[in-house]
Amino acid sequence: MSITKEFDTITAISTPLGEGAIGIVRLSGTDALAIAQSVFKGKNLEQVASHTINYGHIIDPKTGTIIDEVMVSVMLAPKTFTRENVVEINTHGGIAVTNEILQLLIRQGARMAEPGEFTKRAFLNGRVDLTQAEAVMDIIRAKTDKAMTIAVKQLDGSLSQLINDTRQEILNTLAQVEVNIDYPEYDDVEEMTTALLREKTQEFQSLLENLLRTAKRGKILREGLSTAIIGRPNVGKSSLLNNLLREDKAIVTDIAGTTRDVIEEYVNIKGVPLKLVDTAGIRETDDLVEQIGVERSKKALQEADLVLLVLNASEKLTDQDRALLNLSQDSNRIILLNKTDLEQKIELEQLPADLIPISVLTNQNINLIEDRINQLFFDNAGLVEQDATYLSNARHISLIEKAVQSLEAVNDGLALGMPVDLLQVDLTRTWEILGEITGDAAPDELITQLFSQFCLGK
């Protein structure tokens, strides 16, 4: 267990600024109780039991003016998130009252916390490792219940345990190899060492490669699928967007060229966050504003993870339709044949067979879009296996890929008959890379950069 480090006492508002039922101002540090007590009228906070909530008032110690009626939570080290003394002042929600209390605490000796500093202290004091700290932010940013499930498992230590167990096995292997090198007098020691190294390296590589296979699904659930809705003007793109969102975000008219910009919204499709991009209809136009929208649409198409191409079933294919079919053919594409509630005139024989006939007006077959997304990105395997550990963070994925490369270097060296003591270098490098994931071997600059992405008060 890490020994709690000595820091100054920090404070910040932990709830979003604005009107609300409750606001929370948090303190953490050695002097948290004394500073809170200096502005609190009620029980002596320095004498109350840990993990209790205490009623009272916040007052200005200079004037005696009551600032607010509050409930104050007292949590004593080390059984707190930061492993320091923590005080949370529960106020009435609102910008003025929370800011006033924050300024009082700063005047009484607390320092304004940096973004993510509470979680950073939890990391530095050994309460969480780096993957668990990152999971805190993932929980805050989760857009679906599936994304939250993955983040909660990571916070619970599932990824940490896997990485730490693997690092320990690598360390055990390195120790055994070192012992064998130190006792070369046995005739078969070199052969035994090579066999051990080959077996364990392949075992480690297989484990990490299996973990990498979860990255595609995990990253999608964490970051969402960038989804471009494309089609020529007035085929129903904006109506589809509104249908998926179940609210009117896009202008819907019979006038071609109404959507002149790119509209972005998130929607939860069976646990998958889709970043829906409703693009301006792609067509040749002399309207300068519309031209800009069309160019942005083409860019959105190029960058999209998923393309929803909308065609009009009540009209024959146009040159614009054919151009869009060609433009999107190399994408992860779902072709949607809209307006099937009208008389059908489109030439089906000229279209791929896996299209989905829909009617945005009557909500026909919208559920089939969700099923097709599952087929395209998850091979019908479902989204989240309850006991599985997923990679979802780009930093983790990159480091696991580097670790696999180091293990491949060991295997290549074994195949070439390189001396075992040279191969130890690459295996040791694998151990170090995995340590960067949990923070055991992460540089200070990386740690500072990661926590700077957190919000104030967390």
Curated annotation (Swiss-Prot):
Residues 224-378 form the TrmE-type G domain. GTP binds at residues 234-239, 253-259, 278-281. (6S)-5-formyl-5,6,7,8-tetrahydrofolate binds at R26, E88, R127, K458. CDD domains: trmE, TrmE_N. Mg(2+) binds at S238, T259. GO terms for cellular component: cytosol. Coiled coil: none annotated. GO terms for biological process: tRNA methylation; tRNA wobble uridine modification. Its EC number is 3.6.-.-. It is found in: Cytoplasm. K(+) binds at N234, T253, I255, T258. It comes from the Bacteria. Its cofactor is K(+). Binds 1 potassium ion per subunit. Exhibits a very high intrinsic GTPase hydrolysis rate. Involved in the addition of a carboxymethylaminomethyl (cmnm) group at the wobble position (U34) of certain tRNAs, forming tRNA-cmnm(5)s(2)U34. Homodimer. Heterotetramer of two MnmE and two MnmG subunits. Belongs to the TRAFAC class TrmE-Era-EngA-EngB-Septin-like GTPase superfamily. TrmE GTPase family. This is tRNA modification GTPase MnmE. It comes from Streptococcus pyogenes serotype M12 (strain MGAS9429). The lineage of its organism: Bacteria, Bacillati, Bacillota, Bacilli, Lactobacillales.
